[in-house]
UniProtKB/Swiss-Prot annotation:
Domain Lipoyl-binding: 71-145
Residue positions, PTM Phosphoserine: 82
Family: Belongs to the 2-oxoacid dehydrogenase family.
Span list, region Disordered: 153-214
Annotated gene: DLST
Record note on quaternary structure: The 2-oxoglutarate dehydrogenase complex is composed of OGDH (2-oxoglutarate dehydrogenase; E1), DLST (dihydrolipoamide succinyltransferase; E2), DLD (dihydrolipoamide dehydrogenase; E3) and the assembly factor KGD4. It contains multiple copies of the three enzymatic components (E1, E2 and E3). In the nucleus, the 2-oxoglutarate dehydrogenase complex associates with KAT2A. Interacts with ABHD11; this interaction maintains the functional lipoylation of the 2-oxoglutarate dehydrogenase complex.
Outcome of substituting residue 426 to C: 16% of activity
Modified-residue entries (N6-lipoyllysine), positions: 111
Source lineage: Eukaryota, Metazoa, Chordata, Craniata, Vertebrata
Protein name, as recorded: Dihydrolipoyllysine-residue succinyltransferase component of 2-oxoglutarate dehydrogenase complex, mitochondrial
Pathway linked to the protein: Amino-acid degradation; L-lysine degradation via saccharopine pathway; glutaryl-CoA from L-lysine: step 6/6; Carbohydrate metabolism; tricarboxylic acid cycle
Enzyme Commission code(s) on record: 2.3.1.61
Subcellular location: Mitochondrion matrix; Nucleus
Length: 455
């Protein structure tokens, strides 16, 4: 059967070629009949005859095979070493038209969310991972059929112009009002008011009270709903519980007089803004003071390796700054703080904070860190004990600045005061070292000249 079909195709193609060249007498005007696939090579073939007809036009058709380069498979981007997998949340569906660099899906990892854009203009052919599915680096995500141009927004169809009404003679649809008649009678004279008649109370029927709704009919007062924990929240819970189970956490407290740092900020914030195009805040003072104290107490910058039972001392200072986002708490890292000045620190904090608010933090921005600062004072926290961010050994908690009466030189004065808390791993850091470290931070913030004099 296959050989017969091929024979018919070849014979018909040769006949059509002859028609087009004009060499065949059958193609001049009419066809008495064409016999296909009849010969000694095919004894069982049947005779196929095309009835007499006039050849008006011959049109050729061909099928175009889809080029493999037109359909591409987009894979999961490579993750950092500390991240193994993530959950997929689709922004597009099969059949959607996407432009180049348009976000197709978002992969939520333990630390951040990674957006996967479209590499070219095209149409999504298939989603290879279900919504909420787990993927690793290099896993195929979806297939895209590329198109030439970016998808254009559909223009609203213009409404057809309304046909102009035909001109017709104006006909009054409302008859003219009748002529007003002249009244022949005088209007009635109103009667004088009559005194009110009183009724006995027993004769008054009480008004029926509105029906009271049954308690069971009220809906929504005690409702509850459930939401699945996102991967970042699960990771935060796991790490905090891990720190609680592993570290011997202890917290020491102190208070800082913010008078000098507030005065310095008030005096130089305009010049600082003009020169560096940055606002001078309080966080840079605490970051710089922490780096100064970490150099004086390197054990606070160290960590215990539980696998090898060794203490790892770091010669660099990378400070993580906790930032609250709608998805959860993130801790971007300011690296090599010991080499930075106030302007460098403020610029880095501003850039990382902006990326955190836009959910654009990369995993590399939060990887590592040797010490953490958490500022609960921006939310009004007066006092608190922060939890260590593993694999670190200490965390500093800042709190709200409140005017309080304090004793200064034997007199009571109102000063802007802040409570600070240092939570540390008591397995590695002794109380003396922790208290000394916190007092170094206090001295550097209360009098920044300590940093200049290296006291």
């Amino acid at each position: 059967m296959l050989s017969r079909s091929r024979c018919v195709s070849r014979a018909f193609s040769r006949s059509l070629s002859a028609f087009q060249k004009g060499n065949c007498p059958l193609g001049r005007r009419s066809l008495p009949g064409i016999s296909l696939c009849q010969g000694p090579g095919y004894p069982d073939s049947r005779k196929i005859v095309i009835s007499n007809s006039s050849v008006l036009n011959v049109r050729f058709f061909r099928t175009t095979a889809v080029c493999k380069d037109d359909v591409i498979t987009v894979k999961t981007p490579a993750f950092a070493e500390s991240v193994t997998e993530g959950d997929v949340r689709w922004e597009k569906a099969v059949g959607d038209t996407v432009a180049e660099d348009e976000v197709v899906c978002e992969i939520e990892t333990d630390k951040t969310s990674v957006q996967v854009p479209s590499p070219a203009n095209g149409v999504i052919e298939a989603l290879l991972v279900p919504d909420g599915g787990k993927v690793e680096g290099g896993t195929p995500l979806f297939t895209l059929r590329k198109t030439g141009a970016a998808p254009a927004k559909a223009k609203p169809a213009e409404a057809p112009a309304a046909a102009a009404p035909k001109a017709e003679p104006a006909v009054s649809a409302v008859p003219p009002p009748p002529a007003a008649s002249i009244p022949t009678q005088m209007p009635p004279v109103p009667s004088p008011p009559q005194p009110l008649t009183s009724k006995p109370v027993s004769a008054v029927k009480p008004t029926a009270a509105p029906p009271v709704a049954e308690p069971g009919a009220v809906k929504g007062l005690r409702a509850e709903h459930r939401e699945k924990m996102n991967r970042m929240r699960q990771r935060i819970a796991q790490r905090l519980k891990e720190a609680q189970n592993t570290c011997a956490m202890l917290t020491t407290f102190n208070e800082i007089d913010m008078s000098n740092i507030q005065d310095m900020r008030a005096r130089h914030k305009e010049a600082f803004l003009k020169k560096h195009n940055l606002k001078l805040g309080f966080m840079s003072a605490f970051v710089k003071a922490s780096a100064f104290a970490l150099q004086e107490q390197p054990v606070v910058n160290a960590v215990i390796d539980d696998t090898t039972k060794e203490v790892v001392y770091r010669d660099y200072i990378d400070i993580s700054v906790a930032v609250a986002t709608p998805r959860g708490l993130v801790v971007p890292v300011i690296r090599n703080v010991e080499t930075m000045n106030y302007a460098d620190i403020e610029r880095t904090i501003s850039e990382l904070g902006e990326k955190a608010r836009k959910n654009e933090l990369a995993i590399e921005d939060m990887d590592g860190g040797t010490f953490t600062i958490s500022n609960g004072g921006v939310f009004g926290s007066l006092f608190g004990t922060p939890i260590i961010n593993p694999p670190q050994s200490a965390i500093l908690g800042m709190h709200a600045i409140v005017d309080r009466p304090v004793a200064v030189g034997g007199k009571v004065e109102i000063r802007p005061m802040m409570y600070v808390a240092l939570t540390y791993d008591h397995r590695l850091i002794d109380g003396r070292e922790a208290v000394t470290f916190l007092r170094k931070i206090k001295a550097a913030v209360e009098d920044p000249r300590v940093l200049l004099l290296d006291l």
